[in-house]
Regions:
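Basic, amphipathic alpha-helical/coil surface patches used to engage anionic, phosphate-bearing ligands
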Residues: 1-283
Length: 283
């Protein structure tokens, strides 16, 4: 991946001040005092002012459009605790040799525990924490295990999936290096085809189907970082999942505060509403 040389520190500071002024001057958007958070988003947007503004607009605006995923985000809420048992969602504690962050999604056998909105809510919360902690300096690499995925999972997972894609593409700008999907199920393959149709072409090109044999995974990722549950030498998935939950809980107050920060639709023009989110882009 080509390294983006950041502008001089003074220029970044001016950019952040301009973004804050823009937020304050835009009637339907809230003011934001957290300069570090804004700088991280700006960095992920490769220091492009207009792209940063677009991501921020979507970030606050989509809360009203998709409240099932973007509101009531208490990591200790009973529903989100149950979601931990449905899908093991975890980040590796160590970066790969090229500075990428491994993010695991391991679907568990008991489909009765799965609620798509709660699972997607935790995904988006994790993306926020990745931003806040600056965990992915060189992008994100997903490993999604569908070994236990069945038709009952499929029926649930497709609920809200269009909303999730819109949120991730419109609001977040982490570099997605690749998504390894562990499966030998034709059902999963067809589901992925449906989902990727909603995604930009660049994202589709980064989806890699991987069989259930883990023999090649350490060579394709980073053996030292990859979980020992998947053939690597890194910590167990259970250990990484617990650490990830602790990270989410660390920002519990922040998540609760964010519930009160969203756009004011009454102050947004009808033309803006009509033209918003027509174009989805990904780096």
């Amino acid at each position: 991946m080509t390294t983006i040389e950041p502008p001089p520190a003074e220029q970044i500071k001016k950019d952040i001040a301009q973004i804050q002024q823009w937020l304050t001057a835009t009637p339907h958007l809230p003011s934001v005092e957290d300069e570090d958070w804004l700088e991280t988003i700006h960095r992920n947007c490769k220091f492009r002012l207009e792209k940063t503004k677009s991501k921020l607009d979507a970030y606050f605006s989509l809360k009203g459009k998709h409240p099932a995923i973007l509101r009531d985000r208490d990591p200790l809420a009973p529903a989100l605790v149950t979601a931990r048992s449905a899908v093991t969602l975890a980040v590796a504690e160590q970066l790969t040799t090229d500075g990428s962050l491994l993010v695991y999604h391991i679907h568990q056998p008991d489909h009765s525990l799965l609620n798509a909105a709660d699972y997607y809510k935790r995904i988006v919360m994790l993306h926020d924490v990745i931003l806040l902690e600056r965990l992915a300096p060189n992008g994100v690499l997903f490993i999604v295990d569908f070994t236990h995925f069945r038709y009952q999972h499929f029926l649930k997972i497709m609920m809200h999936v269009r909303a999730l894609v819109e949120i991730l593409v419109s609001c977040y700008a982490e570099k997605i290096k690749a998504a390894y999907l562990i499966t030998e199920s034709e059902l999963v393959v067809q589901m992925i085809k449906l989902i990727t149709k909603l995604s930009p072409q660049k994202m589709r090109e980064r989806v890699k189907l991987h069989g259930t044999s883990m023999s090649k995974m350490p060579r394709e990722v980073d053996e030292e970082v990859l979980s020992n549950d998947l053939g690597g030498k890194g910590p167990s998935l259970a250990h990484s999942e617990e650490k990830t939950q602790q990270l989410l809980e660390k920002y519990r107050d922040w998540f609760l505060e964010q519930d009160r920060i969203c756009e004011n639709l009454a102050k947004r023009s009808k033309k803006e509403l009509k033209e918003s989110f027509k174009k989805l882009e990904i780096d």
